[in-house]
């Protein structure tokens, strides 16, 4: 049996060209492409990470094609011979989301898969907490026809973010990682929900409570022992208990080597201890609102 395919221009049949290929040759070629792709899929670089998607608050949904340029290049070259026999599978889709907003803010992320060829939508998550880092894992349960994928009618990822922060500000960053496989076999699977794996936050204790770093910071930025032949005595760092709604306080005790100097009329923030009348730090009557208005936004 032979398949004859003809390409004709819109002006008529005079510029047409045709070729013939046997069914056995077509199947052999399809098998070779499928095997070659399977070997590359089983190799160390089986997953694709194309770019990072910055999700902005209230912006238009971000749309990303989940068929790599390499696969589209193969399809465009081989489509005249094997296009009707090949499919694109998405057997692994991972979506790594990292928030850019604080836990005190609120927001939601909507993620969907869109099959442009059929017009069907699959929900990944329609109300994910925008402040929570996580990894989504799943797959698409149907095959995409190679001829559709070559035309750009492939599987799309659609993402939208809404948050309580400023409009068009970065809510978070999404890293899509997927596997797109060429095969002459068509898959038929029962659809399953995407899995979501939360990512725990790290603790800053190691760096923040590093006595050496903080001591060096104080010594480098305060006038200690000027004109003295002896080194100043080291200070001791004492972490205070955390109060609800307040940051943990690091108390640096005063001593003869820590003079109460002022810089431009403002006391240096060597010690922040509101409970002590002798404590240095923020001047009396200081408010963050006035600081922002006078120092950060003086022209507003």
UniProtKB/Swiss-Prot annotation:
Keywords: Host cell junction, Transport, Viral movement protein
GO CC, alphabetical: host cell plasmodesma
Location in or out of the cell: Host cell junction, Host plasmodesma
A single BP term in Gene Ontology: transport of virus in host, cell to cell
Family, as annotated: Belongs to the alfamovirus movement protein family.
Function: Transports viral genome to neighboring plant cells directly through plasmosdesmata, without any budding. The movement protein allows efficient cell to cell propagation, by bypassing the host cell wall barrier. Acts by forming a tubular structure at the host plasmodesmata, enlarging it enough to allow free passage of virion capsids.
Protein known as: Movement protein
Species this protein is from: Alfalfa mosaic virus (strain 425 / isolate Leiden)
């Amino acid at each position: 049996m032979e398949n004859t395919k003809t390409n004709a221009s819109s002006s008529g049949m005079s510029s047409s060209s045709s070729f013939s290929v046997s069914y056995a040759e077509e199947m052999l070629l399809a098998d070779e492409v499928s095997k070659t792709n399977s070997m590359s899929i089983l190799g160390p670089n089986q997953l694709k990470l194309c770019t990072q998607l910055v999700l902005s608050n209230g912006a238009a949904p971000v749309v990303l094609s989940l068929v790599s340029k390499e696969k589209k290049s193969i399809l465009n070259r081989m489509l005249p011979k094997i296009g009707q026999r090949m499919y694109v599978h998405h057997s692994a889709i991972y979506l790594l989301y990292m928030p850019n907003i604080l836990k005190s803010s609120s927001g939601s992320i909507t993620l969907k898969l869109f099959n442009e060829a059929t017009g069907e939508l699959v929900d990944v998550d329609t109300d994910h907490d925008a402040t929570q880092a996580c990894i989504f894992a799943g797959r698409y349960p149907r095959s995409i026809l190679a001829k559709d994928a070559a035309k750009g009618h492939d599987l799309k990822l659609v993402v939208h973010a809404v948050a309580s922060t400023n409009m068009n500000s970065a809510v978070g960053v999404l890293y899509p990682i997927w596997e797109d496989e060429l095969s002459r076999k068509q898959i038929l699977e029962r659809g399953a929900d995407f899995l979501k794996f939360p990512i725990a936050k790290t603790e800053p204790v190691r760096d923040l409570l590093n006595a050496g770093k903080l001591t060096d910071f104080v010594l480098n930025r305060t006038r200690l022992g000027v004109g003295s032949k002896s080194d100043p005595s080291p200070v001791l760092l004492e972490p205070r208990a955390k109060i609800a709604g307040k940051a943990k306080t690091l108390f640096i005790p005063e001593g003869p080597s820590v003079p109460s100097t002022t810089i431009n009329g403002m006391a240096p923030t060597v010690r922040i201890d509101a409970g002590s009348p002798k404590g240095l730090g923020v001047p009396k009557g200081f408010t963050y609102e006035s600081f922002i208005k006078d120092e950060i936004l003086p022209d507003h």
